[in-house]
């Protein structure tokens, strides 16, 4: 399937009552899409193209930890005062816990949108039957989606579901998952076009997004995988017919990508890529936001991984990179960034894949997991394993 074909600017995306000016969603990413990163993405979109047009999703929290009101989890659900719509992703394996968490979100006004994660390929999650392993148990999957939808009845909070193609090439689940989610009242579905066995390696199979779009007719289908620039997003929508795109690793170290996407989808002029000096200022702003959220010590520890992504493809020198990777205070960060050559233009080598990729691997599953897809027993220990955020 060709990935480069011009299309006209896309219309807005509607997810339940939520209407977006561009069909773009920030994928929830653990340790990344906290309130600081989301605020930075929105601020850059506003400053560069004058819009805040997409949906920016909070990093995943576990349903069990949420209803237990674990302090770390509650802190993870922080939203900016001007953030709208507020979008929260739940990791969940139990219909009862799902219902309680969704009722809590709705009753306490914690968010305006609930997404559910059935796409995590991490072995410690799948070996207990959670994440990307769970949609194989189609009855249990349906009960979980139905519980969240039932808990939000009478509110304006839409429930959406994100999943992968399946466990591996021999066990595709995405068409059943899409059909079930649609039937149980989900407002949209999103497909990461890789199997759990692929993890983040190889190439996303956009053909499976097209198949899901043909299979799910009454709600939006969003595509995720291998979108690193606006051209990729336009190509995915053109070639698959999907209704929107979900941006994950492509925005790591490039939070201005959402401004570029907004411009592409609205037909506006593309913003000029930042120079190294402008990237340094963005890092400073990111560090300020992280320090406000976590405190300076943790905020500076958190910014370290982002700096490696920000400087990808730029000339910085190994000594300066090492110093930035150990930064402890904002003043130190500020001084080190002053040593960069601010006149360096954005290099072509700074685009493309970034973040974790790894290699494909056999998916860790509970014993006997693949025996009966209609077994609706809650996997033992999977709900509690993530308690604490």
Curated annotation (Swiss-Prot):
Keywords: Flavoprotein, FMN, NADP, Oxidoreductase, RNA-binding, tRNA processing, tRNA-binding
EC number, UniProt record: 1.3.1.-
Cofactor: FMN
Any single Pfam family the record assigns to this protein: Dus
Keyword tRNA processing applies: yes
GO molecular function annotation: flavin adenine dinucleotide binding; tRNA binding; tRNA dihydrouridine synthase activity
Location of the active site: 120 (proton donor)
UniProt-listed InterPro entries: Aldolase_TIM, DUS-like_FMN-bd, DUS_fam, DusB-like, tRNA-dHydroUridine_Synthase_C, tRNA_hU_synthase_CS
Reactions catalysed, as given in the entry: a 5,6-dihydrouridine in tRNA + NAD(+) = a uridine in tRNA + NADH + H(+); a 5,6-dihydrouridine in tRNA + NADP(+) = a uridine in tRNA + NADPH + H(+)
EC main group: oxidoreductase
Domain of life: Bacteria
Sequence positions that bind FMN: 28-30, 89, 162, 224-226, 248-249
Subunit structure: Co-immunoprecipitates with DarG in the presence and absence of darT.
Function as written in the Swiss-Prot or TrEMBL entry: Catalyzes the synthesis of 5,6-dihydrouridine (D), a modified base found in the D-loop of most tRNAs, via the reduction of the C5-C6 double bond in target uridines.
Protein family according to the UniProt entry: Belongs to the Dus family.
The protein, known as: Probable tRNA-dihydrouridine synthase
Organism of derivation: Mycobacterium tuberculosis (strain ATCC 25618 / H37Rv)
UniProt lineage: Bacteria, Bacillati, Actinomycetota, Actinomycetes, Mycobacteriales
């Amino acid at each position: 399937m060709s990935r480069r074909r011009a299309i006209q600017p896309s219309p807005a995306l509607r997810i339940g009552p939520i209407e977006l000016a561009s069909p773009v969603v920030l994928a929830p990413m653990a340790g990344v899409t906290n309130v600081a990163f989301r605020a930075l993405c929105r601020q850059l979109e506003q400053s560069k193209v004058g819009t805040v047009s997409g949906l920016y999703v909070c990093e995943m929290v576990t349903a069990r930890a949420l209803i237990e009101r674990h302090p770390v989890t509650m802190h993870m659900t922080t939203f900016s005062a001007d953030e709208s719509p507020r979008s929260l992703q739940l990791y969940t394996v139990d219909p009862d816990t799902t219902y309680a968490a969704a009722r809590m979100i709705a009753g306490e006004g914690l968010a305006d949108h609930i997404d559910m994660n059935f796409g995590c390929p991490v072995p410690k999650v799948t070996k207990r039957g959670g994440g990307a392993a769970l949609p194989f148990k189609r009855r249990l999957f349906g009960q979980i989606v139905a519980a969240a939808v039932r808990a939000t009845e009478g509110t304006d909070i839409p429930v959406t579901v994100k999943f992968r193609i399946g466990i591996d090439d021999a066990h595709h689940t995405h068409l059943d998952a899409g059909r079930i989610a649609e039937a149980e009242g989900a407002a949209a579905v999103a497909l990461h076009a890789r199997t759990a066995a692929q993890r983040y390696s190889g190439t996303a199979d956009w053909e499976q997004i097209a198949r899901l779009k043909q299979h799910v007719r009454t709600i939006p289908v969003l595509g995720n995988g291998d979108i690193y620039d606006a051209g990729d997003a336009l190509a995915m929508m053109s070639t698959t017919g999907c209704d929107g795109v979900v941006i994950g690793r492509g925005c790591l170290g490039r939070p201005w990508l959402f401004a570029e996407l907004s411009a592409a989808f609205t037909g506006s002029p593309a913003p000029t890529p930042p120079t190294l000096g402008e990237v340094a200022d963005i890092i400073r702003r990111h560090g300020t936001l992280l320090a406000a959220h976590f405190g300076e010590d943790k905020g500076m520890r958190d910014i370290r991984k982002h700096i490696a992504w920000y400087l990808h493809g730029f000339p910085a020198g190994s000594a300066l990179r090492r110093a930035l990777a150990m930064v402890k205070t904002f003043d130190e960060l500020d001084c080190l960034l002053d040593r960069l050559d601010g006149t360096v233009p954005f290099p072509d080598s700074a685009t493309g894949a970034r973040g974790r990729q790894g290699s494909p691997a056999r998916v860790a599953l509970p014993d006997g997991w693949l025996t009966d897809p209609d077994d609706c027993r809650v996997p033992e220990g999977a709900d509690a394993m993530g308690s604490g955020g």
